[in-house]
Amino acid sequence: LFRSERMEKIYYNWMENIQDWCISRQLWWGHRIPVFYCDSCNHQWATKEDEPKMCPKCGKEHIHQDPDVLDTWFSSALWAFSPLGWGNNGQMQKTFGENDLKDFYPNSLLITGFDIMFFWVARMMMMGEHFMGQLPFKDIYMHALVRDEHGAKMSKSKGNVIDPLDMVETHSADIIRFTLAYLAIQGRDIKLGEKNLEQFRNFTNKLYNASNFLSLNVDTFPDLKDIEIKTPLGLYMQSKLSHAVDELRNSLDSYKFNEAASTLYRFAWMEFCDWGIEYSKASKESIVELGSLFKETLKMV
C-alpha cells in the first residue's frame, strides 16, 4: 500500500499505539455535530434529521442542537467516497453520476504529504473500511517536505523561505520541476538550494547546445519510427536510449520519480551529449539518426 517502507513502519507504529480522538471543535464553521438536547427532560439523541421538531422521548419542542462542530479531519476522512454519491440516496440535486461510486471507489493512488498521514490518510482508511468495506486507495505516495539547503524547515521568521515565483523568474519552471523530481527520494525530505538549481540549469544548457549543434548540421529530423538506424554510432545510441526508456518506465510505475529523473539526466548528458554528440563530429552520416534519437530524448524529458 505505502510506496515507502519507512512511511509504512511509521504508520503501523502509530496505529498500534493509537489514542482516543476528540472529534468536537469549538469553531464557528464546520459540520455541526448531529446531537440534540431536550430542555424539558434532558434527553440526548443523535439523528439524521437536519432539524427535528420535538423530543422523541417526551414530545416537547424545547430542544437545541449541540453547538460544537466536527473536527475538520472527521469530514475529510469521508472524502474518498462522500463526493461520489455515498449517503445521498433520494437527493434531488445530484452533483455526481449514477455510477461514480462504483467506478471510482476505491481509487488507484493517493498522493499527499507525510505530515498529514495520521490526520487524513489513516482516518480515510478507517472510514473506508467501516462504511465501504474496503480501503479507499490501492497505493499511497507520500511526497517529501521541501526544506532549505541545510535541512531546516522553511519559515518566514527564519528568513529561509524560497519563493517559487522568484525561482521561476530566475531559473524557469522546467528547471524547478526537474530539480524537485531529481531530489524526490521516497521517505526523505528535499534539501533545496541554489546549487541544486544551478546543476539542472547546466543540464538544460547541455540539451540546448546539443539541439543547436544538430540543427546547424541538418534542417529537419524525421521521427524515429520513419527511419532505419544503420550507422554504428546510431545503433549504439539507439540501444542506450531503449535501455533508458525501460528504466524510466519501471521507475515511474514504482513512483520513483528521482530514479526516473536520474535516468534521464544520466542518458541525456553522459551518454547522448558526452558520447553521441562528440563522436558524431567525426561521423557526419550519423547526424540525422542522432537528431531523431534526440527528439525521442526530449519527449522523455
Predicted regions and their residues:
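Structured secondary-structure scaffolds
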Residues: 2-218, 237-280, 289-299
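Intrinsic disorder at enzyme termini
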Residues: 216-226
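Short linear capping/connector segments at secondary-structure termini
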Residues: 224-229, 282
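Alpha-helical transmembrane bundle of multi-pass secondary transport proteins
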Residues: 227, 231, 235-240
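Conserved, non-catalytic sequence blocks in retroelement Pol enzymes and Pol-derived host proteins
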Residues: 285
